[in-house]
Structure formats: structure tokens, C-alpha cells
Amino acid sequence: MNCRFRFSLIAAGMMLAASVQASEAKYASSDVPHLAPEKQHATASTRVASRYMRSHYKHFTLDDQFSGQVFNRYIEMLDYNKSFLNVTDVEQFGKWKNQLDDQLKSGNTSAAFDIFNKVLQRRFERYQFALTQLNTEIKFDDKDDFVIDRSELEWPKNDTELNEIWRQRVKYDALNLKLAGKKWPEIQKTLIKRYNNAIKRLTQTHSEDVFQLYMNAFSREVDPHTSYLSPRNAEQFQAEMNLSLEGIGAVLQVEDDYTKIRSLVAGGPAASSKKIAAGDRIIGVGQEGKKVVDVIGWRLDDVVQLIKGPKGSKVILDILPEGNNAKSYTVTIVRDKIRLEDRAAKSEVKTIDGKKIGVLEIPSFYVGLSEDTKKELIKLNDQKVDGVVIDLRNNGGGALTEATALTGLFISSGPVVQVRDSYGRIKVNGDSDDQISFDGPLTVLINRYSASASEIFAAAMQDYGRAIVLGEQSFGKGTVQQHRSLNHLYDLFDKPLGHVQYTIQKFYRINGGSTQNLGVVPDISFPSAIDPAETGESVEDNALPWDSIKPAGYKKLHNYNTLVPILAAEHQARIKDNMEFGFINEDISTYKKEKDINTISLNKKTRVAEQDKDDSDRLARLNKRQKALGKKPFADLDAVPKDYEAPDVYLDEAVAITADFSNQKQS
């Protein structure tokens, strides 16, 4: 993305050739397929509807009201940013709004295909228009602002408004390339290829794509963890469950033509690189020794195929971080087999004010975690640690049995979690071995991305009074899903029907409260730029609500009601003048000021000035750290080592609180 173009007679010739190419798309309207349901879709549709209504934890009625919700979701999934359809299109689709419930039950998918075919044509028209905008060089001197997120705006009234949206969209794409150091001929060539590739992918759309999208519009209206997987995606899911894929260890999704990183697999290559984060966008993928391919607008499965490869090989990714004015950068990652056993728990000892504090990092609840943790605790006990921090940040969960077994390492016996099914039946999972692996001061560090099994463990430690929970409010994913094939043994279809994943149970703490939606609220909260009102289960549409049941029979081990305020006061005094927490508070302030800004300038000077300020602020922060460490300042950002890591101030503070905890226990 950073290669430069030297002007010459050859360059001028290439520019002219590109201009001709721009006005002539490689595909005609007739190349866009008119898709129709396949024979197996009727049966699959009725079975999906029947399965959800009969077996889902959430009891719902598939009626006209629910039909309207599915309709709105389907339109949103087809044109989330309201940049392809106009208001007349949407009004015409409205005839189907109250009919989808009956169609889902009967297996009639005609509405879904009629709507999808219209959207395909509208997408073709928009990309055709985008190509015409590349006939002449785009200038970035005017005052012009691009609306980034149009989802809450009204639908465009007509093609004139859509044309203006796309004029700005093309200018936005071109300016991003300009800011990455490209000259106009290369910008033109890149965007011509990008938009023609987008049209090409329209021509490669299959009926299975339509059916999967439609079924997921239905599924997401039931709850956010319910989904339909097409036969191809179901096969990929099984491969992942068998741990046979080799790649970078990232969960991807498509959002407004971008391949976005939804989450990172703990212990995987991407997470280990520490250069990629959830929310980042992959805009280019290249193989070792080959040119990076622009993947904006690509199908997700095609991007995944580019990223996957043999273990030990390298993949080059162009990354555009989250944020309106972010600068892209390139990361090289060595592919590896993504195996659960590679995400093992590990421990280390940190010394603070004469106290030895063990830190136990648990990236996921893999099978065998409790046994690994027991071994690590033996090591920590041998080193006579004064306390232990269990680090569950970014731990998305895993095996429920391991959450129960892990809890058992810190209590003698007792209930750990309650599980209720859709019939109201409650099962209590607990520990009964009467053995404790560590009985000293214990803290649990969580963040907003600690979910599921992580929340079960943290909640149990909190309810028993066995540990003090630190950090951020956790994610709030307190449900159990089941994965089932739609096929029956007696089916005679040539093609499989796909699979469904749906919610069947809900978790409850031993105090009776659910972890669903609310998550676990820490005893001592850390400053964070992550707003629980904007991230987590509670933000998801149709998330199951928090509720409570009767508490399980358990005995509280400790009551820290008087100790927590003392530790919290020491924590506040410590971070008040702490430089790193000062940086965090600056970030929180900046985020609050900028989070509702929904436009970005298309003026080059303005954008360059914004980026220069961001770079200057970052360099100043880095050099404040260097000065505090007694090290030489960086001359510029290029001088910063590629493997530079910022201090883990949250973990450092958790260690300090645990040391305070140990002191208080001794006194």
C-alpha cells in the first residue's frame, strides 16, 4: 500500500489507459444473476422455523409483528449503510412486511429472493456509477465532508441523492489511498480494480447466499447467538471444531464492505503479534514475496481463503485501525495451526514493595485448563507468593466443566453455577473434591471482553467472597447454544440443508442472579474507554434479559465489604498521579468528545493536519514514557521498534491491589 508511482511518459500512458478502463466496466447488467430458491430451501426454511419455535430457550410467536421485525432486519443486512437502495425501493418491498411469518412456516422464500435480486441490481448500478467518477483525476482541495455511518439517517430519496453519496464515497476511497502515499494513476488503477471486483462478486452470488442471509435475518430476531449456517459454512464450522484450520486466529465479519476483526483467538498468531486488535479492518492481503491484494468489498469467505495457508508460511495484511481518521499500516504474520491446547495457562511472579504476587494468565477455558492451572499454582506455592492475580481479560470462555473445575481449585466444595433450560428445569454444577490448590489472597482481573465461562468463574469467586474482582464490567454472555444439522436420515435431497445454532439454556450465579446481559460488575473498577452502553451483550439487539432465580445453597467464605473500600481508596490514591492512567483518562476524554462525530473531511490538508496531530501526540506520549524510564527519546515514529509494547498498566495495578490485599490480610 506504500509503493510510489513515478511520473513518466509510460505513467501518462498508463493513466490514459486507466481512464478508458474506468468508463467501461468489465461486466454488463445482464451478467448479474437473477437468483431463485433451490428445491431444498423450502424444507430447510420450515425446519428452521419449527426448530426455533419448538426448542429455543426464548418463547416467541411467529406472527405479523415478528414478520415485520424480520423484514426490517433483512433490509438492514442487505443495505446497512443506506447507500444502495432509495426510499421507493424500500416502500415497494413493504408489501412483504407482514407475510414473512407465513412464508417461513410454509417454506416459501419468494419474498427474500425478490428483494435480494433488486438489491443485486442496485449494487451493480452503484459500482457502475463509482467507475464513472474515476474518468478524471479527483481533487481534494474543496471543503467536503463524508458521512461515515448513514444507518440512522433517512433512506435516499432518489438516484440524485445516491449519486452524491457515491461521489463522496469514491472521493473518500481515493483520499485514503492518497494519504497512504499513492499517486493518481495508481489510485485510479486500484479503485477501478476494486469496483470491478465488487461487480464480479455480484455475478458470483449464489442462491445459497440469499437463503443464508434470509435465515440469519430470522435467527437474529430471535437472539444474537442464534444463527443458520449454509452447508459450506457448516463444513467450515466443523473444521474449526476439529481444530484443523491454519491461519492467523481471528474471527472476521463484513461491515460496510470492510473485513472487520470481530475478535482474536487467544494464543493465536494475530493476538500474539500484539499489532492487531478487535475492530481493526483488513484492507489488503498478500502472500510472502507477492503483491498485497486490495480486499475492500470482497466476500468474507474469499478473504478467509486468502488469509489461510500452510503452517509456517507468512501472510501480509494491510490493516486500517478502528476510527475515522486512522492510518493504515502493514503487518506480517506467520500462520499457525489454531489449536485450543496452544492457549495454555501460564504464570509468572511479580515483586512489588517486597511482596511476591503470582500472575496467572488464562486466555481461554480449554479442556484441560484446570489441570494446567493446578500445576502452575504448585509452582507459585513453591515460590511462596503472597497473593495471586487471575487474568481473564479478553477470555471469551470455553468449556463449562472447566469453569467449574477451576473454581474448585480455590474452594473446598460447593455449587459453582446454575443452568436453567427453556422448561424451567434447573441444574446445579459444583465442586466436591474437598481439595484447595491455593488459599491465599486472590484477585480476578476482567474486562469487557471477558465472557461466558470467564464470567461464571469470576461470579463464583465474587459470590463466595473468595476473591476480589477488578477491572471492567464483563461482556454479559450468559447463555448456552446447541449446534444441530437440519438433515434427517430419510432425506433424499441432492444437497444438504445446513445447520442451525440456537440458545437452549441460561446461566445463573449461585446467588441467583444471571450473568446474562449484566455480566459481572467488578468490586473495584478501573478507568476505561470502553463504555458498557456501547459494547457487550446488553448492546446486542434481541439479547435475552437479565433475571434471577432462587440462590443455590452455599456458604460465603469471606466478607470483604469493609476491606474493598480500603483497597479502592488505596487504588485511587495510587492512580491519581500515575502517568499511564493519566494517558487512559486523556483517551477517555478524547473518545467522549469524538464518538458522536459522524463525518470525515475529504480535504487533504485537513486530513493531513489531523493525522500529523495524532502522530505528534503519540510521539509525545511515547517520549514521556522514555523519559520516565531514563531512556533516550525517539526522534520520530519510524524510530519506534516494531516490537514496542506499551506497559500493561491494568495488570500492574491489579498486582499492586493484590499486594495491598495481602498486607491487609496480614494486619
Model-derived features with residue positions:
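Gram-negative bacterial Sec-dependent N-terminal signal peptides
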Residues: 3-21
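Acidic/histidine-rich, surface-exposed loop or edge segments in extracytoplasmic proteins
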Residues: 25-33, 45-57, 95-99, 193-197, ...
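N-terminal-proximal low-complexity accessory segments that begin disordered
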Residues: 37-79, 87-89
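PDZ/PDZ-like domain segments forming the peptide/carboxylate-binding groove
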Residues: 76-77, 98, 112, 117-128, ...
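Extended, domain-scale alpha-helical bundle/helix-rich regions
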Residues: 122-247, 253-256
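Polar, glycine-rich mid-to-C-terminal structural blocks
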Residues: 465, 470-533
